[in-house]
Amino acid sequence: MEQQETVKKDDASSARPAKAIVEALLFAAGDEGLSLAQIAAVLDVDESEAKAVIAALQEDYSREERGIQLMELAGVFLLATKKEHASYLKKLVEAPGASSLSQAALETLAIIAYRQPITRAEIEEIRGVKSDKPLQTLMARALIKEVGRAEGTGRPILYGTTAEFLDYFGLKTLEELPPLPEWADDGELEREADLFFEKLAENLSDEKP
């Protein structure tokens, strides 16, 4: 007999498969999150049933022993760390061995620095590859932040750099970023900016004992 995947409000056990699916969807969606309509469409249920699944999952995450939460922000649902654990996340960022950034993270950061505010889709169009992981890394290290929402379908998140970004690279203002040629296309932007940040990161690494 085929296992029932949809949610019945009067049967708590049937909610388990749907909760697991929603959790996986939100994890895969990352910072962009998913709307109620998107979740309902994937589960093949109406929005009221999808909302019940989300509420059940939110209740699970509200327990003290859970380190993440399910938030609703600007009409979309997404997973995020709890604020009470911010001090531990800061320790992770400052821990020895955590200072170096991957090539993918440097590329993504360079694009954001020069093109902010910018959406994930625009970043991926320039890089030519998915950028979920680099964005998560940069967010975790507080080098970038959400600065708003773009107009249009889904109102995607806009990313920009932070004060920590300036501190990390020893800059006082964004004006200290080296100017790019006016004719630079997206490929040239990525190459030039990436070289600059890679060199800065190497210098910072050499200065550390």
Swiss-Prot record:
Cited Pfam families: SMC_ScpB
Keywords, sorted A to Z: Cell cycle, Cell division, Chromosome partition, Cytoplasm
Highest taxon of the lineage: Bacteria
Source lineage: Bacteria, Bacillati, Bacillota, Bacilli, Bacillales
InterPro entries: ScpB_csome_segregation, WH-like_DNA-bd_sf, WH_DNA-bd_sf
Family affiliation: Belongs to the ScpB family.
Intracellular or extracellular location(s): Cytoplasm
Name the UniProt record assigns to this protein: Segregation and condensation protein B
Subunit comment: Homodimer. Homodimerization may be required to stabilize the binding of ScpA to the Smc head domains. Component of a cohesin-like complex composed of ScpA, ScpB and the Smc homodimer, in which ScpA and ScpB bind to the head domain of Smc. The presence of the three proteins is required for the association of the complex with DNA.
Native source species: Geobacillus thermodenitrificans (strain NG80-2)
Gene Ontology cellular component list: cytoplasm
Gene that this polypeptide is encoded by: scpB
GO biological process: cell division; chromosome separation; DNA replication
Function: Participates in chromosomal partition during cell division. May act via the formation of a condensin-like complex containing Smc and ScpA that pull DNA away from mid-cell into both cell halves.
